[in-house]
């Protein structure tokens, strides 16, 4: 599925949902994305980074999005791709980070005109803000377990602390 919205000033935001696209070749043929960028977007283990392509002035951001559904004993993060071209911002998303697209859409709807970079950085802030409640909860849990360990050191409490450190 493709979402296309106007940012203003002739700029466009296009979101490509990888889970709903029928043919991945469309990313290259229709949207002009290079093979390397497509490979970044498809790689579940891609690390967060930024690339600048001097030839065409394209900037690619890979940013880690927190999966809000804790399926395991720990939280996972999944990469989301942002591509900034001359007059458009392309995001490549999936079901794990769809909540970000919804929040980006609400942000866009509440602002008349946005530059590509203002919208990009607002989007990155949306993603970063999702981490704060999780970090605060983990910090609170760590303090509780530390308090229990100070009262009485048990194997169970040591494992609980260990789980927090890896989670």
Stretches found by the model and what they are:
Residues 1-167:
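Peripheral, non-transmembrane regulatory/ligand-interaction domains of membrane transport proteins
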């Amino acid at each position: 599925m493709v979402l296309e919205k106007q940012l203003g000033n002739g700029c466009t935001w296009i979101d490509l949902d990888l889970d709903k696209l029928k043919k991945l070749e469309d990313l290259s043929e229709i949207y002009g994305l290079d093979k390397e960028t497509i490979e970044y977007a498809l790689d579940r283990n891609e690390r967060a980074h930024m690339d600048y392509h001097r030839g065409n002035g394209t900037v690619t951001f890979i940013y880690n999005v927190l999966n809000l559904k804790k399926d395991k004993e720990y939280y996972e993060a999944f990469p989301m791709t942002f591509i900034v071209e001359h007059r458009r911002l392309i995001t490549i998303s999936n079901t794990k980070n769809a909540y970000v697209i919804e929040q980006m859409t609400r942000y866009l709807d509440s602002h008349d005109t946005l530059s590509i970079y203002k919208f990009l950085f607002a989007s990155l802030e949306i993603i970063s803000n999702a981490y704060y409640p999780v970090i605060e909860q983990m910090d609170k849990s760590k303090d509780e377990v530390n308090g229990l360990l100070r009262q009485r050191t048990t194997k169970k409490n040591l494992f609980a602390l260990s789980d927090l450190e890896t989670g």
